């Protein structure tokens, strides 16, 4: 594998171990030219996925883009990185296992919402605020109430209960 730092065409594997509950292999590599170390992951890819955007555009599915959007919602949340990786792997497996190569951006968003709801309520609401395009505070209130998340955030001040 080419070194991402100096471009040397061959790197050495220093350590290799299972990751993501055995669904991936994590490899630590070192470049013999510049001595830089980096990590790679090897995963099974059942099929090439294409995401159909709301605009009609079709783009290749990008696991890293999915990871970045979830990491943004998880910012400053005390969640183990392995749990996030497991959630992402689960989403990808579900998308690949449908047998379809085309998936809608809505379907990807729904799966992320489902995963975050089970993982962290604050991250769930953060992601929803972008995915569902919240524009005002009332949008948050309605979403939290509609999604029965009051147990996570407490009752509204104007509730009579």
Curated annotation (Swiss-Prot):
This is Transcriptional repressor NrdR. It comes from the Bacteria. Binds 1 zinc ion. Residues 1-23 are annotated as: Disordered. Negatively regulates transcription of bacterial ribonucleotide reductase nrd genes and operons by binding to NrdR-boxes. InterPro entries: ATP-cone_dom (IPR005144), NrdR-like_N (IPR055173), RNR_NrdR-like (IPR003796). It holds the Pfam family ATP-cone. Belongs to the NrdR family. The lineage of its organism: Bacteria, Pseudomonadati, Pseudomonadota, Alphaproteobacteria, Maricaulales. Residues 49-139 form the ATP-cone domain. It comes from Maricaulis maris (strain MCS10) (Caulobacter maris). Its cofactor is Zn(2+). Residues 11-23 have a biased composition (Basic and acidic residues). GO terms for biological process: negative regulation of DNA-templated transcription. A zinc finger (unnamed) spans 3-34. One of its GO terms (molecular function) is zinc ion binding. Keywords: ATP-binding, DNA-binding, Metal-binding, Nucleotide-binding, Repressor, Transcription, Transcription regulation, Zinc, Zinc-finger.
């Amino acid at each position: 594998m080419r070194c991402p730092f100096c471009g040397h065409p061959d790197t050495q594997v220093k350590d290799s171990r299972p990751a993501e509950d055995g669904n991936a292999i994590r490899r630590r590599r070192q470049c013999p030219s510049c001595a830089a170390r980096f990590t790679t992951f090897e995963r099974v890819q059942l099929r090439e996925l294409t995401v159909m955007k709301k605009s009609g555009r079709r783009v290749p599915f990008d696991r890293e883009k999915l990871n970045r959007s979830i990491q943004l919602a998880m910012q400053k949340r005390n969640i183990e990185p392995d749990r996030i990786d497991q959630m992402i792997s689960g989403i990808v497996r579900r998308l690949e296992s449908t047998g379809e190569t085309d998936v809608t951006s809505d379907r990807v968003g729904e799966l992320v919402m489902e995963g975050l709801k089970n993982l962290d309520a604050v991250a769930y609401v953060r992601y929803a605020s972008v995915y569902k395009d919240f524009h005002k505070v009332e949008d948050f209130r309605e979403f939290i109430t509609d999604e029965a998340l009051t147990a996570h955030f407490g009752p509204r001040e104007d509730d009579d209960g």
